[in-house]
Amino acid sequence: MKYAIVYSSRTGNTRQLAEKAFEVLGEREGGECVYFGEVPAGPLEGATAQRFREAEILYAGFWTDKGNADSGILSLFKELGKTDNMPPEIILFGTAGFGADQAYYDRIIQAAACELPESVKLKASFMCQGKMQQGVLERYRSMLEANPQDGRAKLMVDNYHAALTHPDGTDMAAFQHFLISSVPAAGMGE
């Protein structure tokens, strides 16, 4: 089975997951990666468009922005939907600064899935916590300075620090297990 792995990563979290997917899927018998890399800039043309057209399944990784996939990956979905370049199945994976809440992860996946062309089947999804940029911590600290009794801001600062090690070894092991269980080895799903 031919597959493509595309990702968008601001802090490197989602890139780590994409690299793990490339490694794990590359070890699977019967699969061929036709594209691996960041979301292409601009319209899909030429060889890049052909690679997406060849893929039977797309692994699409994103970072979370305001409760949805980031604009880069959403733009790719729109671009693929305008043409016949979209693989028939997709597996979404991503990272979010706020972790340990499966219901939150489910809402993010649901929001991202709503952006997919109707012809595409969401086969599976995976989310884990990821570290955030320093500017996020500074924003939360400003909130606390303005109101030292702000429990929500305190919670956000604590969460920022908890996220610094993610994706960690446990996250990566869970992602590897997810990948292996999502696509059978023999023929990679045929």
Swiss-Prot record:
Domain of life: Bacteria
Pfam families assigned: Flavodoxin_3
MF GO annotations: FMN binding; oxidoreductase activity, acting on NAD(P)H
Protein's pathway: Porphyrin-containing compound metabolism; protoheme degradation
Purpose: Together with BilR, catalyzes reduction of mesobilirubin and/or bilirubin to urobilinogen, a key step during heme degradation. BilS is probably involved in electron transfer for the bilirubin reductase BilR.
NCBIfam families assigned: flavodox_BilS (NF045594)
Protein name, entry field: Flavodoxin-like domain-containing protein BilS
Species per Swiss-Prot/TrEMBL record: Clostridium symbiosum (strain WAL-14163)
Organism phylogeny: Bacteria, Bacillati, Bacillota, Clostridia, Lachnospirales
